[in-house]
Amino acid sequence: MTTDFTRKGFLGFGGAFLATGGLDAGAAAAGAESVPCAGTFDLVVAGGSATGVCAAVTAARKGLKVALVEYNAFFGGMATSALVPVWHSLYSTDGKTQIIGGLTEEIEKRLAARGEIEFKDRTDPSVGCYFNTAAMQLVLDELVTEQPTITTFFKAQVVGAEKDREGHLTAAVIEDKSGRRALKAKWFVDATGDADLAARAGFETWKLPKSEIQAHTLCAIFANVGPIYDKYKAFVLNEILKPEFGAGLRHVFGWWAPVVGAHDLYFYAGTRITDCDPSVAEDLTQALLEARRQIRKIVDAVNRKYSMPDGKRFTLVSLASDLGLRESRHIKAKYRVTEKDVLYGRHFEDCIAKGSYRVDIHEGRGIKFRYLDGKEQKMEAQADGKVAWTEGRWRTDSDPRPTWYEIPLRALQPEKAENLICAGRMIDCTREAFGALRVMVNCNQMGEAAANHVVRQLQCA
């Protein structure tokens, strides 16, 4: 089935959102004056994902004293704790122009020096490279520990903020093994993914209705996939998700690949969690339990269907400690990026990042893709377990075809914030634009850009 998606229809396509403001007054006012101070810095970076590391390292290399706060025991966020082993292309959609460099490229080169990354076709709309997620932890450790002016706080979360006037922060309050402590600073970067610092400091945030928030995925690594392929040449792991195989799941698509450096192991992203707002503790808890239930169902279904010699079994060897989270809170910023901005390649005077990843929206029982060249694809699970693919166009062939898009600094700047800037998936953008902007290679650039903005502001002070 082919459908013509006109430009008129495209421009009218949008989604509702819910304004949430900051957190309640008690959370936002968890003040620094009543807790001991753990240090005074030029910059506090909340969130030690790859995005947060890019922000901290960029600032430290330019002479700033930085505190880096991460709730896990290691850096990397989705690239490590969620076992997501993919970064998308650093090139334009035609593969002719490198549009992303900086620390993202440096990280890839460090992984490549040890054979811990595998590059794909630079024009591939899905995958730029696969990397070993454990090796990624070590590379990010190296980047941070090479900078003597970065102080790291692992197993720590931002629980509040202190302001001396509206829009001006003086400290972030964290909770870690040593208790509740304040980190004082001149500037702050929120790289938490969920806009935790911005919300706790009382800045306005918003989020979509729960039913429209993108679906989340728990990833896992499995052993003994090779023997199944050897015996069953037509084996496709996604087939297990179909109703007739008894896994009891509601979708029939996933994504898998050999683990870099250990091709006898396979990464798999085949779970699907909908109607979950990960900024709500109860939602996140139930999502984790449900995702792990789905993993067990997948393992059991494979072992029922496929027998292997020598008593071998399809075996779960590693389970992500975090959900692969796609979306939660967004900040209310000075500018909201739209799908038109992305897919028509709008240029911004305050451009701080470029990207070429397609619009990719995980919704309900399916996925929708929109490409810069005007193509649209939809994939949806049917009641009978089959996947229905439809292709069409969201714009006419006569429209210009950009090969990349730009991200403006204003979309990272919360309204009324004097010394807070954000980086990552809390960017202010429409649901459709977010489908493209949310991927890690884009977020990493936001981290670097946020740090560079802080450096410029401090130099001008």
Language-model segments: residues:
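N-terminal secretory signal peptides and thylakoid transit peptides that target proteins
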Residues: M1-L18
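Conserved N-terminal/central alpha/beta ligand/cofactor-binding core
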Residues: F13, T58, L64-K65, E70-G160, ...
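C-terminal segment of classical bacterial N-terminal signal peptides
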Residues: G21-G26
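A short, basic/flexible loop-to-alpha-helix module at the beginning of a structural domain
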Residues: A28-G39
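Beta1/beta-strand and adjacent pyrophosphate-binding region of the FAD-binding site
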Residues: A38-S49
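N-terminal Rossmann-fold NAD(P) dinucleotide-binding loop
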Residues: G52
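Flavin (FAD/FMN)-binding glycine-rich loop and adjacent Rossmann-like elements that form
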Residues: K155, A171, E175-W187, A191-A461
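A short, glycine/Asx- and small/polar-enriched loop/turn
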Residues: D164-T170
